[in-house]
Amino acid sequence: MTEQRPSQQAKQPRRDVHGVLLLDKPIGWSSNDALIRAKRLLWAKKAGHTGTLDPLATGLLPLCFGEATKFSQDLLEADKTYEAVVRLGIRTSTADAEGEVLSERPVAVTPEQLRAAIGRFVGEIDQVPPMHSALKKDGKPLYEYARAGQTVERAARRVTIRAIDVLATDLDAAAPTVTLRVCCSKGTYIRTLGEDLGEALGCGAHLVALRRTQVGSLTLDGAVTLEALEAASEDQRAALLAPVDALLQTLPRVELGAEDSRRFLHGQRLPLQLSLPSAEQVRVYGARGEAGASLLGVAAWQGGVLRPERLVHL
């Protein structure tokens, strides 16, 4: 008997799925396409990603399902860490390997010059977003203007580079490269950083590889590929999800008794005696029916009062 393909089987209803999938996005996939595929494989009703990763980039793409989507904005705001391979000596139209070569210059860069140039980009810097980006101008993504051969004025944006570490160099090769680890704020374009570094070195440069390794406190440890997700059984796929509170591990933990838990879930403010500084966000756990202690949500702690901000309904 021939096994039916998934598309030939009776359509399975969408279901409530709650948690975070740490996806190791493959090259060539857009973030949205990867999200749609994972959502279908999990038969999830609700899902969202936590910031786009270019199709040419690989690496960590946290996908939020169900109640975890309430905290996806926190990851959008979080710092990111990337590993980037920059090819020196060639500048392209897209600042990456996909573009047309605009110029070629000889590379005569010493390790000392490289370190000095990199130091100029650590801290708060102004970046002009690349034309080949999803940033919108008058409601239209910049890459659409670029594909039409148009260049539009873009205002520089202030971003923060926390650290740049040199992982490897091959400065004397026929195709000289430098491999960097970059920890940066949201909105930082690594392609632009690579291009600007090339200009600072006087030789030009473009990005040839990019991999995201960390988003906030989440890392590639335990991340799953789309291939592994597709090959897994339904139960195995569900087990690959991290719990909702995986997004909240940097927040202090507060546990409530049964009565305070009930009041918290009704959105009531709770005067409590807690050894925590004021104005701090906390993750709140407590009794939920017969389920025992579980995540109830996130609250603000100020002036001895716990104020519910985002409730979780699991």
UniProtKB/Swiss-Prot annotation:
Protein name: tRNA pseudouridine synthase B
Name of the top EC class for this enzyme: isomerase
Gene that specifies this protein: truB
Organism: Ralstonia nicotianae (strain ATCC BAA-1114 / GMI1000)
MF (Gene Ontology): RNA binding; tRNA pseudouridine(55) synthase activity
HAMAP family referenced in this protein's UniProt entry, alphabetically: TruB_bact
Active site: D54 (nucleophile)
InterPro entries: PsdUridine_synth_cat_dom_sf, PsdUridine_synth_N, PUA-like_sf, PUA_sf, tRNA_psdUridine_synth_TruB, tRNA_sdUridine_synth_fam1_C, TruB_C
Name of one Pfam family that matches: TruB-C_2
Family label: Belongs to the pseudouridine synthase TruB family. Type 1 subfamily.
Keywords associated with the record: Isomerase, tRNA processing
GO biological process: mRNA pseudouridine synthesis; tRNA pseudouridine synthesis
Catalytic activity: uridine(55) in tRNA = pseudouridine(55) in tRNA
